[in-house]
Curated annotation (Swiss-Prot):
EC number(s) stated in the UniProt entry for this protein: 2.3.1.1
Protein name (record): Amino-acid acetyltransferase, mitochondrial
Protein encoded by which gene: arg2
GO cellular component terms, A-Z: mitochondrial matrix
Keyword terms of this UniProt record: Acyltransferase, Amino-acid biosynthesis, Mitochondrion, Transferase, Transit peptide
Subcellular location: Mitochondrion
Composition-biased stretches (Polar residues): 75-84
Disulfide partners: none
Length: 690
């Protein structure tokens, strides 16, 4: 018989002191409070990441939370079974359906889409997508990070796991004097991160020390066992790997570069390390390879490095927000090497004749020289430049290493995979509980976006790469913003601005026509008609633009593009447009900006084309017009420097030219006159609606 006995109570034949039950109740209450607080912080992180409803649908289609059917469980054992094994085996996830219906500003984030947003196709995803979604993370210079930063990084990794993204982290302790010290530091930092993960609510770490092996016949290490990696990842553990490899011949341990460890993990999880039998049926080989790729999806490559995102030394931008690797990798790599060489030149003693003059001509250090060096005497300048020159050179080497690593890894992965470089401090600051971020005297504002959570939900950078810097608002107080990278797509630009800059008196530009054999005119016409959902009068359009083309930009296989022209203001006779006094008044005009419907709102195609237009082709500015009811206008508005409604018409005019109309009213009048005068070339001849 069960009943109270004095201050004790009897349960299942035993007597438990009442004091113990009180302590158990208090402990469970504290646990529930901790879980409630963790849930609150988790959802605050999601909300502050500001994903749109469309992004939420896309996330849910990639990371469906599907429960597998289970055999019926006897009623008497059902509760016990669920208690013991439910949490361990369930797929992590979160119901975001109604969560994203709350914020108007979130729902109205502009996306380049010229038609109604299609419903997200989730039929394939529901129940069919059983791939393990993995993020490979490189934590650089872990020894230099304080405990608070490590804890913030650990919390974010735990939140990624909860959102369905398993993480495998390579811990790089940083530069060390010798091999033994380096391996010891690597183990210590791996333990430090593992302990921080275990301390998070729901966080579980699994440290792997013997996962890498090295063969004398190849430089790159490989993974000793695929299942050693996959088992803990499937059980919702965050795998922590030390970049130490063991020799297959001698079993001797040696350090390997963390970038090599990341490459080895990428190759293994991408299914590229399977030994190929030359006698095997090719169809069997293809089936096995496809099965390996379906088993694991390496969705993200994450580099957490104190040097931050990739800086930009050319153009108005200070950093690369988005990198289209197919188009930009070689140029950015050369840009970083050029910056490093410029530092080394003026640090060299042979350049000391006029150190300040040489330095101020070099973009990467001009600010430092202007503020710190120039005010000093000549004798004081050189030691300061030498000391900081070494630091800047080391930082640039870090940027080059990160860029090369992501280029090599993204090449091995599907085009849908992406990468992000950000600082551990930015991740940690945005992961901290909200009340810790504000002091008593501060005013509460919107919580800082967590770059990793935002990137997972949206597969985009924190802000669009084609936004002018003044429209990006106040971002994190970091000197090195995040960089988002994708394999992307190649760009075809005619004429090539690196060889012949686009100019109204450029001979190449005058002779370029849309009949050029380098241009696939039928595909270009299809791109325009698909994007605008209108039939083009091709011959009328060709007769209008041929002879005045500034250039053409094509993204990928005609997935997006822009046609730009040099237009003549109406008060200049057409036959006089090329006279020297009139050339300066020719208007750079965006005649067509088109993206295939299937590529609108995703993949960054519109941003890739727009960036090429305003940064590479026409950095001095360009104007265009758009119907007043065009849903793309919000997207245009954010990327332009000005907009103007053309009274008496259904047109709005946009431009990216600086200081217009304030300092150049004539140019503004020419822009307006051109935008009013151009006649459309649609086959339906419905110019009235325009």
């Amino acid at each position: 018989m069960t009943g109270l006995v004095g201050e004790n109570f009897r349960r299942d034949g035993g007597v438990i002191p009442a004091t113990i039950t009180k302590n158990l109740n208090k402990s469970s209450g504290r646990q529930r409070a901790r879980e409630k607080m963790a849930d609150k912080e988790f959802f605050l992180s999601l909300l502050s990441s500001a994903a749109t409803k469309r992004d939420a649908k896309a996330y849910l289609s990639r990371f469906p939370s599907v429960k597998k059917p289970k055999p019926p469980i006897p009623r008497q054992n059902q509760g016990a079974v669920e208690t013991q094994s439910g949490k361990e085996n369930e797929k992590p996830g979160v119901n975001l359906g109604s969560f994203y219906g709350a914020t108007r500003s979130v729902l109205e984030t502009p996306v380049f889409r010229q038609g109604p947003a299609p419903e997200t196709e989730t039929a394939h995803a529901i129940g069919l997508d059983e791939a393990l979604h993995v993020a490979l993370v490189k934590l650089a210079n872990a020894q230099s990070l304080d405990d608070e930063t490590i804890q913030g990084v650990a919390l974010t990794l735990a939140q990624l796991t909860r959102l369905g993204m398993a993480s495998c982290v390579v811990v790089d302790p940083g530069p060390m004097q010798d091999e033994t010290t380096w391996r010891k530091a690597a183990a210590e930092q791996a333990d430090r991160l593992s302990a921080a993960i275990d301390a998070c609510d729901g966080g579980k770490a699994r440290r792997l020390d013997s996962v890498l092996v090295k063969n004398k016949d190849r430089d790159l290490p490989k993974i000793i066992s695929r299942q050693v990696l996959l088992r803990p990842l499937r059980n919702n553990h965050i795998v922590v790997v030390t970049p130490v490899a063991y020799s297959e011949e001698t079993c001797k341990a040696s350090s390997v570069p963390s970038s090599d460890a990341m490459l080895a993990l990428t190759r293994e999880l991408a299914g590229l390390e399977r030994k190929h039998d030359p006698d095997e049926d090719p169809r069997v080989t293809a089936e096995i390879f496809a099965a390996l790729q379906k088993e694991v999806a390496v969705d993200r490559l994450i580099v957490l490095d104190s040097v931050g995102g990739i800086p930009a030394f050319k153009g108005p931008q200070q950093s690369h927000v988005f990198v289209n690797m197919e188009q930009e990798f070689k140029d950015i790599e050369a840009e970083l090497h050029e910056a490093m060489a410029s530092i080394e030149r003026f640090v060299d003693p042979s350049a000391e004749s006029d150190i300040t003059e040489a330095a101020t001509k070099s973009n990467p250090i001009s600010k430092f020289v202007a503020t710190e060096v120039t005010p000093l005497s000549t004798g004081q300048q050189k030691p300061l430049i030498e000391a900081n020159g070494g630091l800047m050179t080391s930082t640039l080497k870090g940027h080059i290493e990160n860029l090369r690593l992501l280029q090599q890894t993204l090449t091995l992965l599907p085009p849908s995979s992406s990468a992000i470089i950000t600082t551990p401090r930015d991740v940690a600051n945005s992961a901290r509980p909200h009340q810790d971020v504000l002091s008593v005297s501060q005013v509460g504002t919107r919580r800082q976006k967590n770059p990793l959570i935002h990137n997972l939900l949206t597969d985009k950078p924190v802000y669009s790469s084609s936004l002018p810097s003044e429209r990006r608002g106040q971002t994190a107080p970091s000197i090195a913003p995040s960089t988002f990278l994708k394999r992307g797509m190649p760009l075809t630009i005619l004429p090539d601005p690196r060889i012949t800059p686009w100019s109204p008196n450029s001979p190449d530009g005058h002779h370029l026509t849309l009949d050029d054999p380098r241009i696939d005119l039928p595909r270009l016409v299809h791109l325009i008609e698909d994007s605008f959902n209108r039939k083009l009068d091709v011959q009328d359009y060709l007769s209008r633009v041929n002879g005045r083309l500034a250039g053409l930009i094509i993204a990928g296989e005609y997935e997006g593009g822009a046609i730009l022209t040099w237009e003549t203001p109406p008060d200049i006779p057409e036959q006089d447009r090329h006279k020297p006094e009139n050339i300066s008044r020719l208007v750079p005009y965006l005649d067509k900006f088109a993206v295939l419907k299937r590529s609108q709102g995703a993949g960054g195609v519109a941003d890739i084309v727009f960036n090429a237009m305003v940064r590479t082709c026409l950095p001095g500015g360009v104007c265009w017009r758009s119907r007043m009811d065009n849903p793309v206008n919000k997207w245009y508005f954010e990327r332009s420097r000005g907009t103007w409604k053309l009274n008496g018409s259904n047109w709005a005019m946009f431009w990216t030219t600086p200081r217009v109309p304030e300092e150049d009213p004539l140019k503004f009048r020419d822009y307006e006159a051109v935008c009013r005068s151009i006649q459309p070339s649609w086959a339906d001849k419905k110019a009235v609606v325009d």
